[in-house]
């Protein structure tokens, strides 16, 4: 769950990442061992982004390492993914999102609809945005009760939560 002020921060960070990196799609996903939920996205509604990047984001969060894919059509993680086969995601760069204590929260990822060679500078910018985001939100603060509108519930296995602007 996120507080409304946190949601505004998340949305600003995803929009900032899109502008700074010049990409059409950005996703901020909170990822658990068996599930993930896109907390904020730019370029596409969150439910679509979750379907597009879930496999990649889980790998980044689990490994606590970045994942950089220049052309997912030729990458073992992406070649058989419907989003890649349909041309919705071709290039992907994702970094883990850590809280101030070093705990893994999820991922911040950027995607493109065409092959893209990610530069060192772009990856450093992505890391910078993720670092600032991880330190800008008080992850231990109480979240809004589930009964409040536009809330975010902790995801259950196999179920994402729609983006507030979608419902």
Task: Walk through the language-model features, giving the residues of each.
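PAS (Per-ARNT-Sim) sensory domains
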Residues: 106-107, 123
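Short beta-strand-to-loop transition segments that serve as allosteric relay/switch motifs
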Residues: 107-116
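Intrinsically disordered, low-complexity terminal regulatory regions
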Residues: 1-53, 123, 127-129, 136-145, ...
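Regulatory sensory and allosteric helical modules in signal-transduction proteins
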Residues: 25, 31, 35-41, 46-90
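Glycine-biased flexible loop/turn sites that connect beta-strands or occur in inter-domain linkers
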Residues: 28, 102-103
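A short, aliphatic-rich beta-strand micro-motif
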Residues: 90-99
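Short hydrophobic/aromatic beta-strand element in the GNAT-like acyltransferase core
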Residues: 25, 94, 107
């Amino acid at each position: 769950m996120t507080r409304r002020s946190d949601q505004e921060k998340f949305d600003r960070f995803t929009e900032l990442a899109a502008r700074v990196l010049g990409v059409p799609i950005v996703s901020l996903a909170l990822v658990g061992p068996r599930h993930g939920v896109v907390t904020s996205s730019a370029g596409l509604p969150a439910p679509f982004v979750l379907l597009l990047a879930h496999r990649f984001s889980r790998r980044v969060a689990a490994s606590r390492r970045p994942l950089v894919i220049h052309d997912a059509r030729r990458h073992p993680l992406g070649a058989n993914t419907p989003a890649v086969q349909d041309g919705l995601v071709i290039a992907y760069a994702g970094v883990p999102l850590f809280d101030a204590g070093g705990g893994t929260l999820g991922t911040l990822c950027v995607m493109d609809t065409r092959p893209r060679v990610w530069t060192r500078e772009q990856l450093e910018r992505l890391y910078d945005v993720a670092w600032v985001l991880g330190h800008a939100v008080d992850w231990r603060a109480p979240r809004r009760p589930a009964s409040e509108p536009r809330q975010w519930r902790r995801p259950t296995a196999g179920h994402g939560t729609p983006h507030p602007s979608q419902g």
